[in-house]
């Protein structure tokens, strides 16, 4: 685990312990059951992918550890509507506060503003967070293999399935892709960003895609800025892309989204 992930995992475990003290599992389960039904995150990506076109998971992100503040004019519901107007298939909403200036309320507000499926972009280290994600309205969760062992990953995926949610399993290298296959992952995200140097290289997707489970829908993450990047990733075998920073920095988010999708 890299230093940044170790730091995040440490504060996230403390945060989860505090949240558990304030909210019983019974209360959480009741809230999860009361939430609107999951919208089908993976199904939306499958429906929107076509030859020559990647489905888009558009990310709502105010800041990041590597880039600092990304968008000062930050209105999650308005951004969600702009992404929807631009043709996004799904949305990714950052809810981590310390590293990304996210908030749980952003996910609630975004899901109320649009009809697109939403993934909660956070750092999950405990199955309790999966039920919490469903209670917040999330349709999918992120499982970062660089941060957890296979036992925890399996528990997160099982809990997501129980609650009718999809799990996007994120990998960064060959060893993690092999783990994703053994875990039975059918929605795999390849992060093109090196978590130690923060350098982004689209060749990571090209290298790892050939090792992906044959039945997995591949999502390429980070480093896509122009239509040529999209075409390159589709040629590598990706069926969807997760894009945040390059769109968040645009004045006209809807127009930028349309341009990226071609």
From Swiss-Prot:
Parts forming coiled coils: none
Disulfide bond annotation, renumbered to this chain: none
Record-level Gene Ontology MF annotations: indole-3-glycerol-phosphate synthase activity; phosphoribosylanthranilate isomerase activity
Entry's EC annotation: 4.1.1.48
EC class (word): lyase
InterPro entries, per database record: Aldolase_TIM, Indole-3-glycerol_P_synth, Indole-3-glycerol_P_synth_dom, Indole-3-GlycerolPSynthase_CS, RibuloseP-bd_barrel
Catalyses which reaction(s): 1-(2-carboxyphenylamino)-1-deoxy-D-ribulose 5-phosphate + H(+) = (1S,2R)-1-C-(indol-3-yl)glycerol 3-phosphate + CO2 + H2O
One Pfam family of this chain: IGPS
Family: Belongs to the TrpC family.
HAMAP family for the chain: IGPS_B
Stated name of the protein: Indole-3-glycerol phosphate synthase
């Amino acid at each position: 685990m890299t230093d940044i992930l170790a730091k995040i995992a440490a504060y996230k475990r403390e945060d989860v312990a505090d949240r558990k003290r304030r909210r019983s599992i019974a209360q959480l389960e009741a809230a999860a059951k009361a939430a609107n039904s999951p919208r089908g995150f993976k199904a939306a990506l499958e429906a929107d992918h076509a030859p020559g076109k990647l489905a888009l998971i558009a990310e709502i992100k105010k800041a990041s550890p590597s880039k600092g503040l990304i968008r000062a004019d930050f209105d999650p519901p308005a951004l969600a509507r702009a992404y929807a107007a631009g043709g996004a298939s799904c949305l990714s909403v950052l809810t981590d506060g310390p590293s990304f200036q996210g908030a749980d309320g952003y996910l609630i507000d975004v899901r109320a503003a649009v009809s697109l499926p939403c993934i909660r972009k956070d750092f999950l280290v405990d199955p309790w967070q999966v039920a919490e994600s469903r209670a917040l309205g999330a349709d999918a969760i992120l499982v970062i293999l660089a941060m957890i062992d296979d036992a925890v990953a399996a528990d997160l995926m099982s809990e997501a399935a129980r609650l009718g949610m999809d799990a996007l399993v994120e990998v960064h290298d060959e060893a993690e892709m092999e783990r994703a296959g053994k875990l039975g992952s059918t929605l795999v995200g390849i992060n093109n960003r090196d978590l130690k140097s923060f350098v982004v290289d689209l060749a990571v997707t090209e290298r790892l895609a050939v090792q992906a489970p044959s039945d997995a829908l591949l999502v390429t993450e980070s480093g896509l800025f122009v239509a040529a990047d999209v075409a390159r990733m589709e040629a590598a075998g990706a069926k969807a892309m997760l894009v945040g920073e390059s769109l968040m920095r645009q004045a006209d988010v809807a127009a930028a989204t349309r341009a990226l999708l071609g």
